[in-house]
Amino acid sequence: IIYMLSRYYPEKKLIVVPTTALVHQMSSDFKEYGYQDECHKITAGADKDSDAEITVTTWQSIYKMPKSWFNQYKVVIGDEAHLFKSKSLESIMKKLTVCPYRFGFTGTLDGTLTHRLVLEGLFGPVEKVTTTSELIESNHLAKFKINIITLKYSDQTCNLLRRAKY
């Protein structure tokens, strides 16, 4: 869906994802889907300026940019939009004052009214496309059963591993 939106709108697009791995994955996916040009990828230390039609970035890489930098974008797409409740992400969205097209995608809306209102303030009305049950019933998602396994360790083992560095 993000790729199709990116192809539909001719204006410059800013795609905000939560991790650097997703910056590279999304850019790679776009190439695989047939996008001929390079997506500009912004991660820590990367040049923030580009004439590319599509910029893919983490919020950590751009939240300190001035409002004037954001004026070049007319489309913003937030992947994993449920993470947009942080102050830095909200500040990015508030700097996009000349950006008429805003899209946020998530499969993990937490259900609280406050969170929903924050997302609607940043992106617009929430549209629920489908549910897990509907995906299972239409055979787009496998039926699954979750078994919880609780592991109980001795106090000695817990104390030994309490200071472990992973």
Q: What are these model-derived regions, one by one?
A:
Residues 44-75, 85-91:
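Conserved helix/coil segment N-terminal to the catalytic DExD/H
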Residues 24-25, 50, 64-65, 111-116, ...:
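Switch/connector loops and helix/strand junctions flanking conserved nucleotide-binding motifs
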Residues 19, 57-61, 105-109:
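A short beta-strand-to-loop transition that corresponds to the Sensor-1 phosphate-sensing loop
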Residues 14, 27, 34-47:
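Conserved RecA-like helicase motor-core motifs
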